[in-house]
């Protein structure tokens, strides 16, 4: 039986190749996690609050606004984010300090290797996927679960679909026949005007009130991302 022996030069070349492969993989993951931590994030819708347009298990690519929090001296009024009525946004209602870059990078790595099924940050944050309806200066009201918006400077209000830049359908709950429309969350809401840096977000399924009807208007810093693309399921893949 013959034995094969490689020369010292061959072994050195092989080790050199292995080091380059390991270094390449390391650079790829560091670049990926840093990039996704600062500029993009992938999220899974875990409930039916956005029915009938979005379904539980849908997976999305969001643009991330979190990198603005790393720039010192940027106030809410100076955050250069172009938010549009009707867009799907990522809302973080966590009241504490935002996770740092290291935490986000580590979280991105864990999310990558677990196919977005586990997150360190989401255990500490309150992350929601919602529909953005109102911008600063808008007058917001609700009639029979349909939001009406009077855009700042306009003399009259329009329905949310008329002012939206995106097409979507809302799901209106069926209330009991004797339900009092004056009760909270009955589908009606008196007009109010959004202040500076205030936004109104809501669920497409109006039976779910875990939105601005409960929280009140949200700050630009609560809106941490804008949905760009649904990549799963494949049958629904496309821009939002």
Report residues per predicted region.
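Hydrophobic membrane-insertion alpha-helices, especially the h-region
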Residues: 20-38
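Soluble "head" domains of membrane/secretory-pathway proteins
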Residues: 2-19, 38-41, 51, 55-240
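N-terminal, active-site-proximal structural segment of metallo-dependent hydrolase catalytic domains
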Residues: 45-48
